[in-house]
Amino acid sequence: MPQLVLLFLVYFGAAKHLGMNLSGETAAVIVFTFWGTAEMGDLVRSALISIPKHQYDSGYGLGLNKWQVYLYIILPQTIRRLLPSAVNLLTRMIKTTSLVALIGVVEVLKVGKQIIDASRYTNPTAALWVYGAVFFMYFIICFPFSRLSRVLEKSLLINREMRINEWDSRF
């Protein structure tokens, strides 16, 4: 379900059907918490499903119990597969916060629109500069997460290759 629909359902639906008068910020926190949790759960599920069955069987064949198989075999592979999707979800959630302006929450885009409206006649190019600044703010927030993801992915890949080489050198 789209986030905007969820925002409207929680913000307006809670007031009408549950008799609760939620603030825009509270409704946004509720929606982003449930949406982010559901999305992350789906990502974890798909990462776990993507691990081939023979990985589990190999662990059991080595005499490991269920917890050891998950801890030593499945979890490291799942994290490697989950990391890019999780960072993508994080950046999507950051960028989707702009929708909360539609339920009255003051955030970056709403402030930008107010600045543009106030200076429309005195500075006709204000929209370009304000939206450029908003873009730059979102970029400054999201870009470090993407870089961190890249560093972590390389680190996990290097650690994996080192373990494989160490394993191969034993034989």
Show the residue positions of the predicted features.
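Transmembrane alpha-helices and adjacent helix-loop boundaries
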Residues: 1-171
